[in-house]
């Protein structure tokens, strides 16, 4: 059946042929365009209507700060230990991959918790603690992540405001097997650089504090311990966003990977989507790697209730099990990386996308504030 999608504020119309519900999924050469609203607001309303006690799960988690401080101290200790070790030695690279990348992935996701104000009551305290947590990353990152991530939540799938989405150029040039391998190896750079080319945010005093503090700390570290210590931070950061088990969450959260994401109890019609459910664009993972990543695998739960801290997301799933158990789930982050790269049906195009609410290049004012 022929169909069209046109946003009411846009002159552009997308034409496509709607496949039968039971047809097999084919390799894409464009994104999954939709004119429907993202599903999380609707599901949140339904859950709150049936289980109003869920509101008691919201709020900050004070003990998280102690874990974050422990990870920062761990990274500082290893950086000091490796201060005289050659960067390209097996000892250096093994520690950077096994411990450093895992720790820095935890730091990425601690900053993610802080971006939702889930460690302290006051937003400013969360922002400043994120600057401290940023230390092992080696480059200033936390202040920019927060506003872009707020846009990702508020405008999921928006072609201009959700900078988590790959661009058309990425889809066009990186959807082959070598291209996907390149994307998976260097995805940290795509996530770091892509937002600046899509949507500009306001540079605030928090950004300045983040940049100045990180540069001063790096300078002191190099002066006292040498370049290899800082190199440990940088290499750990790169590996944390490369071919690392914990990095699988970057792809697993929102890519429609047809061979891996299946309903918990059955696979219907050879697709990853139950006929009773709307097309899925967010996926949860309930495996053991959640213990190292602040339960970021509970991603449907997180998008439904972004103000519930990581320690209480499993309880949300337990209370509202009938809303979450039937949804397609990711079974393995390592498997996601493998299936994404080597399965032809999974490409960079495999994301749900919506026509933008703002014109390209529009400077965001208050939309990105938490």
UniProtKB/Swiss-Prot annotation:
One of its GO terms (cellular component) is membrane. This is Sphingolipid delta(4)-desaturase. Pfam families: FA_desaturase (PF00487), Lipid_DES (PF08557). The lineage of its organism: Eukaryota, Fungi, Dikarya, Ascomycota, Saccharomycotina. It is found in: Membrane. It comes from Candida albicans (strain SC5314 / ATCC MYA-2876) (Yeast). GO terms for biological process: ceramide biosynthetic process; sphingolipid metabolic process. Belongs to the fatty acid desaturase type 1 family. DEGS subfamily. Delta(4)-fatty-acid desaturase which introduces a double bond at the 4-position in the long-chain base (LCB) of ceramides. Required for the formation of the monounsaturated sphingoid base (E)-sphing-4-enine during glucosylceramide (GluCer) biosynthesis. CDD domains: Delta4-sphingolipid-FADS-like.
């Amino acid at each position: 059946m022929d169909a069209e999608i046109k946003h009411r504020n846009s002159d552009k119309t997308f034409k496509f042929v709607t496949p039968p519900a039971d047809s097999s999924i084919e390799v894409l050469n464009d994104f999954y365009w939709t004119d429907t609203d993202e599903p999380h607001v609707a599901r949140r309303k339904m859950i709150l209507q049936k289980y109003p006690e869920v509101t008691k799960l919201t709020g900050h988690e004070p003990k998280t700060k102690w874990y974050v401080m422990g990870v920062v101290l761990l990274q500082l200790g290893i950086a000091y230990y490796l201060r005289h070790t050659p960067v390209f030695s097996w000892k250096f690279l093994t520690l950077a991959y096994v411990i450093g990348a895992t720790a820095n992935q935890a730091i990425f996701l601690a900053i993610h918790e802080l971006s939702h104000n889930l460690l302290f009551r006051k937003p400013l305290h969360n922002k400043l603690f994120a600057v401290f947590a940023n230390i092992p990353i080696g480059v200033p990152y936390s202040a920019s992540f927060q506003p872009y991530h707020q846009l990702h939540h508020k405008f999921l799938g928006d072609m201009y405001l959700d900078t988590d989405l790959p661009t058309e150029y990425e889809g066009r040039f990186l959807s082959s097997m070598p291209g996907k391998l390149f994307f998976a190896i260097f995805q940290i750079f795509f996530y770091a650089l892509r937002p600046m080319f899509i949507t500009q945010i306001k540079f605030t005093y928090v950004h300045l504090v983040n940049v100045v503090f990180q540069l001063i700390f790096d300078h002191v570290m190099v002066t006292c311990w040498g370049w290899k210590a800082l190199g440990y931070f940088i290499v750990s950061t790169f590996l944390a966003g490369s071919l690392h088990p914990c990095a699988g969450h970057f792809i697993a959260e929102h890519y429609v990977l047809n061979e891996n994401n299946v309903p918990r109890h059955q696979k219907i019609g050879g697709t990853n989507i139950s006929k009773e459910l709307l097309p899925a664009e967010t996926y949860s993972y309930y495996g053991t790697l959640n213990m190292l990543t602040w339960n970021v695998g509970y991603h449907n739960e997180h998008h439904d209730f972004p103000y519930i801290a990581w320690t209480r997301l499993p309880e949300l799933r337990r209370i509202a099990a009938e809303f979450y158990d039937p949804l397609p789930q990711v079974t393995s982050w390592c498997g996601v990386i493998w299936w994404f790269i080597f399965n032809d049906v999974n490409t960079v195009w495999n994301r749900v996308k919506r026509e933008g609410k703002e014109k390209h290049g529009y400077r965001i004012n208050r939309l990105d504030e938490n």
